[in-house]
């Protein structure tokens, strides 16, 4: 049996410590993956700093991390989509389950079968690792019935005639959401910084607007004139003012437009939600418990192989080995734009 090592959080607001960890076994509908690349996310450092204040069920020591790409080494009972030796990309849910065997920051991790996709050989592990958490967040907001409930993506989509607003198109979630919404048959209008306009349009957005412009709400209102709105997905960073502006702009746009009146939020709802409009905070991990994960992680493998889905944003490899994960988290706290920080494992 191989030896497993993990970057462990010993306690609340403590730095990661690399040490030997139990070698995991594949339970029912689960696979064990040898991690070749992992990405870091804001939820990782937030959980590291805040622990049970953020997630009351968290106990220590804990292995954090959500995004991995690697090779299947074992499959559990009931697994039909994978076999040992397969290349995969997947969303590790250890923070949600409070199960360190399912945390990404280690050499061998347990994944749910329905939270993983086959990885084509043409796509490097380090670039694939940017996808999972952002993908899960996007599919919850876009396709779960208790959120926007949009039509499911296809390699040959049927046009719906509706237009979706995605605020934050150059974020990791935004890059996934644009592609998914277009593949589901929706026109996408998005916001981002001007230097990312080409990026979001290359992913399928028909128009992009500068979210920092004082006229942004008027610009969006004009862009949606005469269109049927499919609702909005509001994605923003950790700065409270930016998050509030994003939520309010999306809610107001949906309220003023013809069409659906729902906004999926990556931030808490503001105090004054317009009459007739509904909104809900996105919990990405909820997708593991419903049909959307089966449908969309199945679609992801097909779309990656077909070349119709791009692993975006760009991966920036900031180190090699588990010892580099803490540095990656520290760098992420300083802020990044249109890229995702990745650590490779030898």
UniProtKB/Swiss-Prot annotation:
Its EC number is 1.-.-.-. It comes from the Eukaryota. It is an enzyme of class 1 (oxidoreductase). The keyword 4Fe-4S does not apply. NADP(+) binds at residues 43-48, 170-173, 193-196, 211, 251-252, 336-337. Gene3D superfamilies: Medium-chain alcohol dehydrogenases, catalytic domain (3.90.180.10), NAD(P)-binding Rossmann-like Domain (3.40.50.720). Dehydrogenase; part of the gene cluster that mediates the biosynthesis of nigerpyrone and its derivatives carbonarone A and pestalamide A. The biosynthesis pathway begins with the polyketide assembly by epaA to form phenylacetyl triketide precursor from successive condensation of two malonyl-CoA, presumably with one phenylacetyl-CoA starter unit produced by the phenylacetyl-CoA ligase epaB. For the nigerpyrone biosynthesis, the reactive polyketide chain is released as an aldehyde through the R-domain. A nonenzymatic cyclization and dehydration may create nigerpyrone. This is Dehydrogenase orf1. It comes from Aspergillus niger (strain ATCC MYA-4892 / CBS 513.88 / FGSC A1513). The gene is orf1.
